[in-house]
Amino acid sequence: MKWIEKIFDKQNIFLFLLIVMVIFGKLIPYREAYNSYFNLESFIDWGIAGIFLLYGLKLNIREVVRDISNWKLHLLVQLGTFVLFPLLVFLFYGVAKGTPYFITWLSIFFLASLPSTVSSSVVMVSIARGNITSAIFNASISGLIGIVMTPLLMSFFMKQGSADAASHAEVVRQLLLKVLLPIVLGLLLNPVFKNFVNRYSRWIGEFDRIIILLIVYESFSKAFTENVFSSVSPFVFIIIAVSCVALFFIVYHILKWICGRLHFNREDTITTTFCGSKKSLVHGSLFIMVLGIPEEQKVLYLLPVMIYHSFQLFYVSWLANRIAREAT
């Protein structure tokens, strides 16, 4: 019966639904004409703001402050997330620049620029019996740092010629209205709605997933109706898939080696490697909508994020259970 439970695990169901949304985008694509009945794009915009509002409401400031003393672990995780990842991809910038594969490289760099995922990092660390408090701290703080770092890192390589001052101002406005303002509002309302959020945390988590599924559906609908995938050859898909898997293993083992050099204990090593090697599908999906990425390229940016997210869930789930068994 355990194999049945694994198949119907919440994360596996979500991955299955992601695939379903891609299929729906092909078979029943959402078209602009449907906006007169239901404006999906506006609903997603409000949903993005809602996710970050809830993120602010769920953030436990006391937990964050209490665990700040474990600074070596926190620094290593954030350096892995926002320095090591982008640096590894940047090594291939010279190869991709000026070629038809530059957008492919940029989509992988976008993945590398994202913050760590929140929920699955904490869950996997818990399964492997790592330092859960530090996992919560890093998962939370990574999302906040990502609000600044992801747009900053991407700004160095996104086309400047096609974006005038007005479009740059619009990107900043979108980030402020859809990301920063909701988080600040959530933090201010945290003391009032803390108990409510804790009580209904399971249902609140489902809201995140619904918005992500809708973003995937809308993006792939546009991609299929505008024939975007004609530009994604099997060779490009293989490059993206291999790059995602290689990135994970390189970062994971570099962080594990550094943990050994710093004499981290078992629990801190688990937390560092698990949190530092993860990338957030939530933030990836949301940043695609607010960074001024052209409509016809959104799917190309989303593809590496979805591949990496799927791989990290399946592999790290297996790895966490193996580490837990070895500890007993």
What function would you assign to each model-found segment?
Residues 1-97, 155, 159-266, 327-328:
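Structural signature of multi-pass alpha-helical membrane transport proteins
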Residues 71-78, 99-112, 130-140, 262-277, ...:
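The feature identifies polytopic integral membrane transport proteins across all domains of life
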Residues 80-88, 113-118, 135-156, 176-180, ...:
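Membrane-embedded alpha-helical segments of transport systems
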Residues 92-99, 286-292:
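Hydrophobic alpha-helical transmembrane segments of integral membrane proteins
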Residues 227-234, 288-306:
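Extracellular/periplasmic helix-loop-helix junctions in multi-pass membrane proteins
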Residues 250-259, 302-328:
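Membrane-helix cytosolic exit motif
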